[in-house]
Amino acid sequence: MTVAAIILAASPEGALRAIDSRPLVRRLAEAAWSGGGVPVVVVAADPDGAVAAALAGAQVTLAEPAPREAGPVAQICRGIDVARGLVTETEAAVVWPARMAWVDPETLTSLIEAHGTDPEPVIRPAFEGTPGWPVLLPVAHLEALRALRPDRMPDELLDDLAAAGVPFRTLEVGDPGTTHDLATEREDLPPYAGPPEPASGHAHEWGSVAAETADDAPLPGPTIAPWEPAPGR
């Protein structure tokens, strides 16, 4: 089972925003890789190479965005198309807006494990009953997503998919990072609880990486992946 992680940065400035002295996009790429996303694709404009430099040494593919006028739906589809070009066996993608900076890698793992036992629905994480992001989208629903209007924002796109009959599932993960974005400082987040029970029946060995791991602690093994621009939507 191969599940990609698609990180969506709205601008180079947002991608490079310093979070505890590290570029946001680097933090997210490492979290996605640690949580089991393969491949990890970052969709971000990079006019001067600064985003690529921030990702150097990470196991990640940097993809040129679709045209801005094509809307959020095209950016999501762009990332998934690139992931499928890299790994044709990709079955699903975790769509991760970069503003959701505090998501724990365990949440990604929980989404992937849940997809393994229940592969049909779109899976949305929840914290204390409130649905959030990132969202796991099976590629079987990619064309339904691609058909949606370019003026729809990410939450509205999910509503449109549900209205079109795409099945959804909400997964409680106990991660405040799924519902609190960069408008909330990390020290102001509610306590991390973790999932009430593992999706696959076994406990993960890590805890809240956002709360317990030093931000300058490197992850082993990542290298920058080559990439080629794919056609926009």
Label the predicted regions:
Residues 31, 35, 53-58, 82, ...:
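Alpha-helical structural signal in soluble globular domains
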Residues 149-233:
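Conserved alpha/beta core of the MobA/IspD/sugar-nucleotide pyrophosphorylase nucleotidyltransferase superfamily
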Residues 1-49, 232:
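N-terminal glycine-rich phosphate-binding loop and ensuing alpha1 helix
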Residues 25, 142, 154-158:
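Structural element of the ATP-grasp superfamily
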Residues 7-9, 96-97, 125-126, 171-174:
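Short beta-strand segments
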Residues 63-146:
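Conserved beta-loop-beta/alpha segment of the NTase-like Rossmann-fold superfamily
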Residues 33, 41-78:
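Short, surface-exposed acidic-centric catalytic microdomains
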Residues 14-19, 23, 46, 66-74, ...:
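Residues at secondary-structure transition points
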